[in-house]
Each structure stands twice: as C-alpha cells, then as structure tokens.
C-alpha cells in the first residue's frame, strides 16, 4: 500500500460522487463530502439503477457534462462513491474512463456472507490513485479482507 500524493498540477479539479444502490444524491455521506471540500467542485449523482453497465454509462455522461460545465479537461475529475456507486465508478475507470483519482467508500468487495464472490476482476485495469475507505463492521468487506486485493490495483492505493 502506498499513499496517493497529488501535486498542484495533478490534483483533481472536481469530484463526481455517487451513492449506494438504494440511495440518492442527497445521501448524508455525499453531502458531508461536498461540504467538507468547499474548494473543489462536486457533482453528487443519483444513479437510479442497480445495473453496473447502466450506471457506468450514466457516470461517463455526467462526468463529461460536469467537466464541460466547470471548464476542465474530463481527465482532471476524480470519481467515486459509496458501495454500489463506488463499484460502478471503479468499473467505469477500469473500462477506460479517464480520471485523476478514484474514491471508494464502503466498496462492496463481496456480497454479505459470500466471501468467495469477489468483485475485484477489474482491479488490474484501475491505473489511477485510489483511496479505499472501509470499516471493521462492513458486511461487504472489512479492511483486512481488502489487504489481499489492493496490490491488484495498478494505480497507487491508500486504505483508510
């Protein structure tokens, strides 16, 4: 595990953040993130789907529109989300969405109680700095469960 460091030049110019599958853009965590970084433009995006391919399409479209709206190159945006939203963002980046960084909050490493059904097949294609935040009580993946899979991510990773 290495720490993701940004220079002024490489620092993300905006953040597209998505909630879990059953939540919307007004989820308390997304609001707290937006309010916690007032200097960074933030787009809180409701996905309104549990289909990863549909979510990926929505993330890409919203990211391109947001970059245009704030006047930055789309590859200067960071993407992330909570649970399903983070998973969808990670798949989008793995499939080629240019991004400055990835933020995965309570990433669903596996379905609760199904430790053998890992959602890490796309990790090697993630080549951007990635922050993973997980708690000891998270039924979708605890920090020690992530340890064996972080090295699969091609970009720098930080676990918190």
Predicted region positions:
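Serine-hydrolase catalytic machinery in alpha/beta-hydrolase-like enzymes
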Residues: 1-78, 87, 91
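A structural signal for isolated positions on well-ordered beta-strands in alpha/beta enzyme cores
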Residues: 14-16, 78, 103, 131, ...
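The conserved beta1-alpha1 loop
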Residues: 16-20, 106, 134
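Acidic catalytic loop of the alpha/beta-hydrolase fold
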Residues: 23, 136-141
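Short alpha-helix in the alpha/beta-hydrolase fold that links the catalytic acid
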Residues: 30, 119, 128, 141-150
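Catalytic histidine neighborhood in serine/cysteine hydrolases
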Residues: 41-43, 152-160
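Primarily recognizes the serine-hydrolase "nucleophile elbow" in alpha/beta-hydrolase
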Residues: 64-128
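Short beta-strand/loop motif that positions the catalytic acidic residue
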Residues: 126-127, 132-134, 138
